[in-house]
UniProtKB/Swiss-Prot annotation:
Keywords, in A-Z order: Cell membrane, Disulfide bond, G-protein coupled receptor, Glycoprotein, Membrane, Olfaction, Receptor, Sensory transduction, Transducer, Transmembrane, Transmembrane helix
Record GO cellular component, one term: plasma membrane
Protein's GO biological process: detection of chemical stimulus involved in sensory perception of smell
Residue intervals annotated with topology Cytoplasmic: 45-52, 120-138, 217-236, 290-311
Extracellular face residues: 1-23, 74-98, 160-196, 258-268
Phylogenetic classification of the source organism: Eukaryota, Metazoa, Chordata, Craniata, Vertebrata
Principal place of residence: membrane
Name the record gives this protein: Olfactory receptor 10G7
Keyword Ribonucleoprotein belongs to the record: no
Gene: OR10G7
Residues spanning the membrane: 24-44, 53-73, 99-119, 139-159, 197-216, 237-257, 269-289
Superkingdom to which the source organism belongs: Eukaryota
Disulfide-bond pairs as recorded: 96-188
Glycosylation sites: 3
Amino acid sequence: MSNATLLTAFILTGLPHAPGLDAPLFGIFLVVYVLTVLGNLLILLVIRVDSHLHTPMYYFLTNLSFIDMWFSTVTVPKMLMTLVSPSGRTISFHSCVAQLYFFHFLGSTECFLYTVMSYDRYLAISYPLRYTNMMTGRSCALLATGTWLSGSLHSAVQTILTFHLPYCGPNQIQHYFCDAPPILKLACADTSANEMVIFVNIGLVASGCFVLIVLSYVSIVCSILRIRTSEGRHRAFQTCASHCIVVLCFFGPGLFIYLRPGSRDALHGVVAVFYTTLTPLFNPVVYTLRNKEVKKALLKLKNGSVFAQGE
């Protein structure tokens, strides 16, 4: 970090909202956060205890649920504190650094993971006979490890570049958590180079992953159309549709914010709610809980037959 940094704390302005809505918003986001954590924990438990779900697709889903649980935890609790009292808006300099790092670490890891998951679906649908030999346990572990390491490297670069600048003036961040674009507006130095790096760094990562996902699904659709049975086509389309919904909910708001560095602060905050708060809640519902195999596993878990099966 730069030796010229003089600030010891920042003030978060919080989520843009009309006066008098603090209590209702606190209640809404508290419920959303609790449901997000419980929903993703339930998915982790079900996949862990049901041997029928020990497949590559659900292996990657456990990674996704784990990420979503913590991705929401990085930002939502602090947002709730800003709604409770003015003192909750203060965040120390080092806490801000940590929040920025883990936000981009988990966010970029999820971005890479979506790409890996689309590749997994491509192999499963396009090469069903060779799929088990191609997507082995070792291959899954290597792909998952690669996403975590890539996310860590990406976030480290982003965090170092952001806090290498001196911060000695205003300390009010126009956002409900520490993110690079609003933080850079407080720097006591020229930030044009940093903004360009953010645009290229995040833009290339997110756009690159999104393009690879689109290409994967174009190939998947072509393979699905060659499936002879209508039941097989319907099942393949259903699986892919769930993934596409989640991908659009995650990438759409993210690309909108980081590829528009001059966007308004209020708009930035509102759009950020979608991928920091709502997407982690949607994932267990859209991507997993609507799945027939998971529903069966949940029923077995409720009746206790899953644990009896493992004995």
